[in-house]
């Protein structure tokens, strides 16, 4: 009902609705826990000691309050064993499938006291998880602490680009943004940032004069390329730009820094609560041990798969979570490595396969995964295959009690935002998604020559 009212309201009223939602987010995120966390981070002199303390608190809490983890600990005869950061590998790893299938047993509080969240993930598997004001507040505190290291502070003029559908599909006006007044945040649409629309985005940026930008890497890069290709001079200079959700390449960084004349600072986390990897003032990537524990499983040479434990996930705990992302380290790790030995050279993430649209251009894994999010746990696995520009086959593995027609209806609606109205979608329900010879399952396959 609220979506219907929003979509049929004047833009000025939509701005008001966005600001009301922003006020609600502020109450959820800027609690006493936010201020306690950011104070502790600012004053901490030994982050590794803080990590040890936090792991002990986190482990004892979920052992007591999560039925799922309590059973795992007993099953592995670890009830009387003291588990620390140093011997965390005695615990079994968990996967996204484990969370998807057991979320009701994993959560540490009653559902009616939690906030329901979702992620499609760039593997194409949808997942529902839960959080609360305590976890959200501390996570936002860390993000703000990270930005403070680069001169950006809470309340500064900010432009954000993300997956929210802030522009109704039938809107004709070239107004691709909405203003969230409580957060002093201009939210710009990721779904319309292409072609000649980009000149309207840049005109608005010059008018708004943001002090910082954050959000989808590919969209920020697309705007930067338009600025460079058309020799546009901006009337503002941001303090720093913080791309997220997608892999940042060296070429993208160079283009963005040149277009906006400011530093780009990379970051890595996940919507479900993985600990942070962030870039310091010297341009080096650092694991942030105050936010969790990082384990690295060697794939080849200096390439390692990440296994993570997130301290900001007390509601849906992530303990030795196989997140499915990889990093390149500066050096190979010794067998009995410690947290301080992990020196990250590059965040690899997942393969950034992309699809194409005549109307929208490149559609990335992140764009597709946000569509899958809207069908929650009904979709177990998914895969998008494109053999020509106007047709996409969508393979879906669904739960036994899922409504196929409802899934198709929801996905068609979401995908129109990402591809436009001229792309045809062909849905096929299958028992499994085939693996590659290397054992991987690809989320997006582009066969266009």
Swiss-Prot record:
Swiss-Prot/TrEMBL keywords: Capsule biogenesis/degradation, Exopolysaccharide synthesis
Annotated Gene3D superfamilies: N-terminal domain of ligase-like
Biological-process GO terms, alphabetical: capsule polysaccharide biosynthetic process
Associated pathway: Capsule biogenesis; capsule polysaccharide biosynthesis
Record InterPro entries: ANL_N_sf (IPR042099), CapK_Type1_Caps_Biosynth (IPR053158)
Protein's UniProt keywords contain Glycoprotein: no
Function: Required for the biosynthesis of type 1 capsular polysaccharide.
UniProt protein name: Protein CapK
